[in-house]
Amino acid sequence: MSSNANSQHSTLAKFAFNIYGSLNHATPSYEGSASPSSSYSSSRSKTNEPYNYRFNKLVYNCEREVTTLSQLNYPLSLSNTFQSDQNLSHHVIIGGRNYLKLLALNEDQSRIVQDINVLDQSSIYTHNSRVPSTNKLNNINTVKAQSDTIGCGLSNGLITVYKVGSNGKCRLIHKFSDHKRCINSLDYVGIRNLYDAPTQMISGSQDGSIKLWDMRSSSPRPMLTISSGSHSDPIRSCQYSPHSQGRNKLVVLSVHDSGALCKFDLRLSNGHGPERKWNIHTGPALSLHIHPEKEYVVTGGRDQKICVFNYGDSQISNRITPDEMINTYGPVMKVRWCLYPDASTSQFGEPLDTFQQSNDFNSSSLYSYDLACSYLNDDSTVAIYNLNRKFIPKEVITTSSNKPIQNFIWANNPGSSRKIWTITKSNVFSSYDLDMHDSLLESEISKPLDELANVTVDWNNGFGDLCLANQEKYEFEITEVESQASDNDMGDIDTEYSSRYERSNSNSVIDESSLIGSSSAEKPPLFRSSTHYSMHMAKSPSPVPRRGSTSFAAHSESQPNLSNMQGLSMSRPKLTRNLSQATEDSSISIGSAPQSNIHLKSKRSFQVSYASPYLVPVSLPLSLNDENVFEILSNNYLISIPDGFTLVDVCLLNASVAASVQRFRECQIWRVLAVSLEEDYVQIDNTTFLSDPELEHNETNQDEKIDDQKDAKSISSDLGNFVGSYNSNSTSTTNYGGLGSLSAKDTTKANNSNNLMDMINRSRVNSMNHLQSISPSGSHTFIRNAIHENKSNENAIVDDDETDAAVHGTEGRIGTSHVSEDLDNENLNILNNAVLNSSPNSAMTTPHPQSNSPNYSNFFSLPKLSSTFMSPIYDEFAEKQEQPRSLKAESLLNNDVSDRTTTKSELTKAIKEEVDNSSGAPLKKAWKSSSLLEKALAHASNEGDIILCSTLSLLFYDSFKQVIPQSSCLDWLGLYIEILQRKRLFVNAIHVVNNAPDDVRSKLKNLTSGDVDLRFFCCWCQKLLVNEKSKEKLKNDVNADFGYWYCDECSQKQSNCIYCNEPCKGLTVVVSLKCGHRGHFGCLREWFIEDENNECPGGCDYSVV
């Protein structure tokens, strides 16, 4: 018997392979029916090989591209199923490109007992029928099943309706073809439960129309056609509302590409326009779904928002914003309410339906139902949210193949469990039971809430503050709806933070309406201390009324002991959106009176026995994170090389800035980098630097250059550009090395550099007075002689190339006149002061010279006109930039040198020449610029010094790309700009972006720029300013004066500019003050910046400082 069964199973498998091919892509056996063949063969061999399931997950691989699915709740009696599988009531309908299949499931929906090809009318329920040929244009875009009816919306605007028999046979009964474009949504009208037979159907299309069809009639024309307006606004989704309170009222909701939510009443005689229209989303709204019990609809859009809105008649009058809003991490493609309430709501304490009661609204129906959403982009997740905790998903489903989700629905099932059916873009149907606890499901269903800790610590970037948040996991926003007619609005509020823990047994009710206002869209009031001006009554009052009874600030004023507690005596209130002309999310109010509270009939409060959640801010006085120091460094650090400056000069200037705020370590880093740059790099045309290989090659050949090449270095070298005093008569009339006097262009550049240096020194003279202890009189002569005294007396290693005359001096060097000495003193004055100020040890007393007579030997050993004058290293590079000597002194030097034979030491060879070794590679110096820069960046990154990292990246990135990776540079600059913006140093942030390297700038702009959504509301009726009526009416009139200084809804003009009393016609050029007055950007800039006023121009005593 066993061999016959195996033979029969093998034959059926081969037969199924001939029809469908190999469709089982190595799917595990516990994943249910992985192909059409596996479901059929398993049902036939059930008695011999029982189905092996380890959890309730069903997988089916579709052989064609699929886009939509629905559920058919109709009992089927299939002849090829066993007795236990008779009268099956829950089935899956999957549609796609030339594809429409009915998957019959068993009673617990754990496996597929049969699949039926609906498009092939000759196929009843057997498997030996082939799929429809490709020449049939049945590209199904949406499917909706009800009772025994299956409606299909095609991409060509055609609607087909199939009738399903009890034996599984499907036949085509209707074809409707009045739409011009793709069908996006289908629904049935007049349906109250899952098993009612439909008689009417609505369809929403890309052509912007909704059509009503009578399925009892044989006419292919619609009964009614409605649209949202005169122009075509594509309809993404539409649905019939079964919760209409009016008698025989047929309400249909739709969402459009404009982001609008429209409400239609099909009983109206005209039937052409919506009864109500709300602009909820700022981009295309892509999906909607009506709540199973109440008149609430959830919508999702491309603006990454999920909105819950009450569309009931009692809530229509002044509703302009959603009741609830969930911000998601991606554009929302589909959103669905769960069909069953979540039984786990009891985990929030007691069951919600025992205390969430109200006269007009049962909140348990809103907060006990979950909602799920999928995303538009290639995202492989379905996120499940609950309004009790809307800031974090309750569960997240991730497909095992990591393929994007195409569509999903909540499935009806006998056990009333939360079950989701999905199809992916890889054409795989899957079933997920969220209430089934199994270890294998945990890899695909994650619960982010379980992964969070009760206590969270985070740093505030840029300010050095620390925040600790404590929050119980199941006590977040447990809402209770009470009557607004309560005598005590504030309830029993404990005013002391410690007393809330002492009386932990007694519950304290905190009324949220007193904390944030009685409306979620209401802006908070502004309170100021009373003024005593005599002309107070003659001044313009603030448009914002003062309502002390409904604000947290008023309550704080009535209880002065709360001011010492810094707001810790109360639980953290919810963040609200301010209904103003500026934006919903801004705390700045625009316009006048806020929305009235007369339409609000309930208030929300949460009941806790102690403070949960609570936030503990900690301020740490970190010496290395001083805000003033940060601002000084960001303002004064040079992040680019000015004209006439070199990179060495910029490093020295930045060193002086760091020393001025007592950042001596950073000062030394800048100075060491300056010294290493002068040693390793050769400057070409004041801007171009050679790479390391070229520099090393040039260094070995520098000794072979003749003296004429040294003389070719003009007076307008590094220090010549740095100091602009070489246009004097003593230098302009002397031609050294064949160079004439400075041209007009060079003179101008030198003067500009000198002016810039003087300006920098003057701006820092006050901050560096305590570091300077050198006498002003004759300071340059004194410093120069003292330094050469120290240099001649220290035990340094002497280069053998240098003559004794160069080291110790000779009496024959008397050819230098007094004019040359004065010239040196004059030109080196500014640089000496800048470098000495940059040294942390500059405050130490310099040894006095032994005599006041000129020391010619020390003078000739000086490296002339180099910015390494104060550097601790004097090497051959300084000699190469030696100042031209007089002819007499030079002849004496040549005679002295010619009588000597030079011998190089081994140390000189190791430093200056390539020593022959086994590898043949030159010895690398540890103080090369690249090595020092790499170590400086590593140190700054480990210390968290974002200013030093960013400044070094801006200055050295182009020359040292091998040291500074592009990713690191982008991360440092992005974080630096973010901190600058948080500190309101916007000008500095813009300078960082503009001076960023070319290959980093584009990525940096994309990283730092973000979309800002601004929504403007009328200051009188508090409705969104869209003015669609005027826009439609005046779109053909070229001379029409269309704008947003008036409101179409209330037909009133908005407030004029408080400065010029002219209408504010623009949307983005309007600036509003916290007092409620507003005006043009140019007018307020003239008032506050140019005229330097501090108070509001309306005279309401509001001060911006």
From Swiss-Prot:
Compositionally biased spans, kind Polar residues: 509-521, 548-569, 577-590
Subcellular locations according to the entry: Vacuole
InterPro entries (alphabetical): WD40/YVTN_repeat-like_dom_sf (IPR015943), WD40_repeat_CS (IPR019775), WD40_repeat_dom_sf (IPR036322), WD40_rpt (IPR001680), WDR24 (IPR037590), WDR59_RTC1-like_RING_Znf (IPR049566), Znf_RING (IPR001841), Znf_RING/FYVE/PHD (IPR013083)
GO molecular function ontology, one term from the record: zinc ion binding
Pfam family for this entry, one: WD40
Gene Ontology biological process terms in this record: positive regulation of macroautophagy; positive regulation of TORC1 signaling
Annotated stretches, region: Disordered: 481-523, 535-590, 692-711, 734-754
Keywords on record: Metal-binding, Repeat, Vacuole, WD repeat, Zinc, Zinc-finger
SUPFAM superfamilies to which the protein is assigned, alphabetical: WD40 repeat-like
Gene3D superfamilies hit by this protein: YVTN repeat-like/Quinoprotein amine dehydrogenase (2.130.10.10), Zinc/RING finger domain, C3HC4 (zinc finger) (3.30.40.10)
GO CC, alphabetical: cytosol; GATOR2 complex; vacuolar membrane
Zinc finger motifs (RING-type), residue ranges: 1057-1100
WD repeats: 135-172, 178-223, 230-274, 280-319, 377-420, 560-601, 917-959
Lineage top rank: taxon: Eukaryota
Bias kind Basic and acidic residues: ranges: 694-711
PANTHER family assigned to the protein according to its UniProt record, in alphabetical order: GATOR COMPLEX PROTEIN WDR24 (PTHR46200:SF1)
Functional description taken from the UniProt entry: May be involved in a process influencing telomere capping.
Family as reported in the entry's similarity comment: Belongs to the WD repeat RTC1 family.
Record protein name field: Restriction of telomere capping protein 1
Organism: Scheffersomyces stipitis (strain ATCC 58785 / CBS 6054 / NBRC 10063 / NRRL Y-11545) (Yeast)
Organismal lineage: Eukaryota, Fungi, Dikarya, Ascomycota, Saccharomycotina
